[in-house]
Amino acid sequence: MAIRTGFCNPFLTQASGIKYNPRTGRGSNREFLHSYKTTMSSFQFLAPKCLDEDVPMEERKGVHVGTLSRPPKVYCNGKEVPILDFRCSSPWPRRVNIWGEIDFRGDKFDPRFNTFHVYDIVETTEAASNGDVSRFATATRPLGTVITLLGMSRCGKRVAVHVYGICQYFYINKAEVDTACGIRSCSELSVLLAECLRSSMITQNDATLNGDKNAFHGTSFKSASPESFRVEVIERTDVYYYDTQPCAFYRVYSPSSKFTNYLCDNFHPELKKYEGRVDATTRFLMDNPGFVSFGWYQLKPGVDGERVRVRPASRQLTLSDVEIDCMSDNLQAIPNDDSWPDYKLLCFDIECKSGGSNELAFPDATHLEDLVIQISCLLYSIPRQSLEHILLFSLGSCDLPQRYVQEMKDAGLPEPTVLEFDSEFELLIAFMTLVKQYAPEFATGYNIVNFDWAFIMEKLNSIYSLKLDGYGSINRGGLFKIWDVGKSGFQRRSKVKINGLISLDMYAIATEKLKLSSYKLDSVAREALNESKRDLPYKDIPGYYASGPNTRGIIGEYCIQDSALVGKLFFKYLPHLELSAVARLARITLTKAIYDGQQVRIYTCLLGLASSRGFILPDGGYPATFEYKDVIPDVGDVEEEMDEDESVSPTGTSSGRNVGYKGARVFDPDTGFYIDPVVVLDFASLYPSIIQAHNLCFTTLTLNFETVKRLNPSDYATFTVGGKRLFFVRSNVRESLLGVLLKDWLAMRKAIRARIPGSSSDEAVLLDKQQAAIKVVCNSVYGFTGVAQGFLPCLYVAATVTTIGRQMLLSTRDYIHNNWAAFERFITAFPDIESSVLSQKAYEVKVIYGDTDSVFIRFKGVGVEGIAKIGEKMAHIISTALFCPPIKLECEKTFIKLLLITKKKYIGVIYGGKVLMKGVDLVRKNNCQFINDYARKLVELLLYDDTVSRAAAEASCVSIAEWNRRAMPSGMAGFGRIIADAHRQITSPKLDINKFVMTAELSRPPSAYINRRLAHLTVYYKLVMRQGQIPNVRERIPYVIVAPTDEVEADAKSVALLRGDPLQNTAGKRCGEAKRKLIISDLAEDPIHVTSHGLSLNIDYYFSHLIGTASVTFKALFGNDTKLTERLLKRFIPETRVVNVKMLNRLQAAGFVCIHAPRWDNKMNTEAEITEEEQSHQIMRRVFCIPKAILHQS
């Protein structure tokens, strides 16, 4: 590495031309309030004092705070380079040729291009200048919304295509408006709309629109005139209900989204508005057939031959190579081209360090002294999947280990470029300048949405007062924002929206694609890539950082390797392909596809289809008060796992998904263990097929019998849902819009899947992502109608779907029992099965469970080979007899052994030997390895040991009452041996503590928890107390439960004081002593501390936890009674006693003799006969050997 010269420490030297002014507060330079920076003469200086290598060690604590009067600079390869001066050679790659007011493209630059690819769309508002008479000015006077398509031309130019003339519009019922306003014509309505806008100056003089203080308001509203609007009368039909008749609506066109949004909220709020919240981007895509949100376009002359206009550099909105102005008729989408231009990916990771009195505290971006010390940036070409550049931004000098540099070279990777900075601000402004000048289209990292982006944005905003609105693609007034959007699955989630920079967080992708006990990057890399990282404990970072450039290089290596692993994960899972396919299908932007949920995907598709059929969509729909307690939407098989720090209110609703009805019960399972074959028949795409088969939709529903009684009975269907009669007309009367969408999507998916076998490997990957995207959207249709606070709720439709689904399962059960219960009828229907009959006398068929879209059918007296062969025929017979296409049953699997635990929970071995589980996690991320291992051993024994299987099947037939006087079946002895072995292991003096470590996620900062008396938070506070390595938010905290001792109790008291809730004393039972009441979470401890201090584990807790876990899984063997199961499993535990040594000595001195505990007869699986002497021993032990209280799991 080149020797750096001129590294500036303003606290030690006064370099020529540099003036340093110490300060204690934030910088107040108003220059920081501008958009992206091209010049800067001074800035706030924050740097750790540990970088002052020429001062005594005792003076290297804390952070320097002041203002430095010079332009920000970077050191690279021994040279000093101004960060913001574009004329100087850059230490990072640049893709822009315009910087500030200067155009560096040169005279020979050719702006022409014909085809271009779009990856993001941005809406802006323009006000035309008085002297501009172009057609583009006409579209923006007084205000106009402009749609900017961001992308890249086929010839490699980065382009921004500004589309003018896109009008938002909304509908309002003409009769209602005329009555409310006393008008009759479109011109009168235009006058009232303009007056409404102008009057906003009186009540909203200083108000902002949509939270944007830079938005056009005030004077722009004052200039609104009737000519600002185009109003027409058009006949349309409300999409809700079949009996809704077409009527006249005013359709109000507005050139500005600001006007539209204000009017929909404030112009006669009591009047229902239709499609007022449909933004200009959606109108652009919907009103122009074939237009896509992600894909290729070509330029063409307009309808009357109008051509596009190239913007000069002085008028560019972005730093693209070329910007043009056009109208929508200058564009034509290019279908069936799935190729990608050379888009770039930024993969980054930040390292932070607390600079306060406790350097191991959790960094907080609002704390001035908590600093970003390094940022690694890996730059990739997305279509080539190649790593092109490696950059390391370092606060202070940094020398990467030569070993690591050589490893990179040997692997054929780019040599890392190390960029060194005097202050944190220079590091951050350099990183933001890289983002602006390199202008990657995509960014990724690990937990960047919740931490990296959030920390950088907060630091620049709150500490340095630097606005980021110019650091996306838009040069000023753009969107560069991150915000919290509530809770999902009891975890906080955020979203980031940056104009022109699509952020894909691989943490979110990993949690979706993988099922792991820990989602740390190392764990994910091991599982997905079979790679591991060189770990650097957080507690070591301050020491490494302060020790000089060589050890800072170790931190840099750690930082770079994290980004490298994330880059590999990105190109393994290719999330950009699937999400771009969703965006294209749903005709929404890629950012919306990532962050805005399922509702918007269906809404936009429905909007386009409804418009083509003459329907309009009311804003917010018509929220029903409909209550139906027998059904709920079942949106998937994923069972969300509750975070242990939250509880669910039985009546409250969350800020997220609000369902207006509940229930989903079909019929309860016959729980138990089955060793007879069990066939599972599944409905293919149950809810979508129900919607199609029964023509369910907003448009086909009526609540009024008078509406349908004039129709033929075959032209409508009647369903009784929650005591209410609902009527849906058949497709020959009116076709369901939801059904049409599903039919088209499923046909598209089928066609795509048919292309995969004959495609190249690269094309096959892309096609597979496209078909998966269609499946995701199809499965969202049902849930779209069932969310009470959704875009367009219709709980009647959602409840009808689940009601029909339940009826289908019941009718399937009845058909099987009525037609195949008799052996003769069964053989007649399936003559090929006769050779597999084991016993005609033992023959029995019974449906033992109906699970939303599946039926479980048990056959006795017939071999599994024969049953497996007739499964598909069975499904076909039932489908043909009972259901309308496209509803059909399929034979998915046949179990040879099945443990049916409860609804949606079962474990079994399917024909062929594969184990299948649903709703049961043998390896739970909240359990320790000891419990997971033994739970797995018990399940494997049950499923693969035929002796145990037969005994378990026998046990599951025994009634609960009988177990009080009945011995366990002898075949269960194997179960007993495993449980006894677990007990021996946990009571052994040589325990491997790693097998007893549990983890829980720190889902938010500890101060944000309502209940802080949690196991993982206890460990967090103990680490703070001991100045240990502090976990980051969303990291999982490891802990073990220790035995209660005086030391543990003292630590619990200290933790209670630290978190602000001291333990309450309660009166003791002996001698009036006061004892603190400890709960399990108070006994949580850091595993490293336990090992180093020789603390004992809480044996009783762990074994009780094992028994409890096993009881939840195996309660189906014992009448589904968890408490009974615990008692029965504890029969296998050898009796042991913990003897107080002091008491034993006293007893022996008094003449007592030590005798053995009752013997266990393993052969008979019972206790041997207890002698009179042994009985006396038990009595004496209870009297004299009083053990200390041991906590049990609640």
UniProtKB/Swiss-Prot annotation:
The keyword Transferase applies. It is found in: Host nucleus. Keywords: DNA replication, DNA-binding, DNA-directed DNA polymerase, Endonuclease, Host nucleus, Hydrolase, Multifunctional enzyme, Nuclease, Nucleotidyltransferase, Transferase, Viral DNA replication. One of its GO terms (cellular component) is host cell nucleus. InterPro entries: DNA-dir_DNA_pol_B, DNA-dir_DNA_pol_B_CS, DNA-dir_DNA_pol_B_exonuc, DNA-dir_DNA_pol_B_multi_dom, DNA/RNA_pol_sf, DNA_pol_B_thumb, DNA_pol_palm_dom_sf, DNA_pol_type-B. One of its GO terms (molecular function) is nucleotide binding. One of its GO terms (biological process) is DNA-templated DNA replication. Disulfide bonds: none annotated. Transmembrane segments: none annotated. Belongs to the DNA polymerase type-B family. Replicates viral genomic DNA. The replication complex is composed of six viral proteins: the DNA polymerase, processivity factor, primase, primase-associated factor, helicase, and ssDNA-binding protein. Additionally, the polymerase contains an intrinsic ribonuclease H (RNase H) activity that specifically degrades RNA/DNA heteroduplexes or duplex DNA substrates in the 5' to 3' direction. Therefore, it can catalyze the excision of the RNA primers that initiate the synthesis of Okazaki fragments at a replication fork during viral DNA replication. This is DNA polymerase catalytic subunit. It comes from Varicella-zoster virus (strain Oka vaccine).
